[in-house]
Amino acid sequence: MFDAPAPLVAFLSLAIPQACAVCRAGGPGLCGACRVAVAESLWVGGPRRSRPDPEPRDLPPVHTTARFEGALARLVTAYKDDGRRDGGRFLAALLAQAVEASLVGDRRIREALGSNGVSGGVSSRPPVLVVPVPSSAASRRRRGDAPLVRLATLAVRGFGPGEVAVADALRVRRRVADQAGLGALGRHLNVEHSMEVRPRWAADVGRCACVVVDDVLTTGATLGEAARALRASGTPVVVGAAICATQRRGGGSRPASRAPGGAP
């Protein structure tokens, strides 16, 4: 009988996970019980606008699909930090709904999609760019990839090819501390002026509407900084989308309204 070398076994266990990403029960991906548990975190009626309290000055309108809690919180963490990329399609479907809600919720973007242009002129780019919040170089090295870019790429597959494209257009320009454990003010000061548009994307960002995306909306500091960097590069319109929003006592994200038209 063939005995697979230990490194091969370790590789296969990552490539073909043999346990639910949430509860660790047998079977790859996400088990039926955990799918139900994740669904319980979804906003009733579909994606809605979420607003942190206090709300950062630079934060654009942000739509989310669910609360960051329970099984969904564990799935997001497993995908991002534990290498469980097999949960990506499930999370991407939730992110796609939030992106769609942000597109529908902004009149200027609706008009841009209808006319296939934002600021005029000829461009090979679609009128809307989905821009993931950037990871630091250290995070990319540690994880081996950029999980949010992968997630955004999966999320836009259901949109028309001439409507929306993913743009890894932002980069971190200075060192920032881990946001965990910081309050709203601490998070804002930590990421303030920490991002910039990559030079090769500057022209496209300057003429396209942008949807800046993240996995979780907490205080809004990160999405707000990303939006600031895009505006500084001239983007005519910027909105935001995230899979889920935290619900924190004494200051956190609060649902503001349901997205027009509900879930796509």
Where are these regions (language model features)?
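Glycine-rich phosphate/pyrophosphate-handling loop used in enzymes and phosphotransfer proteins
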Residues: M1-P264
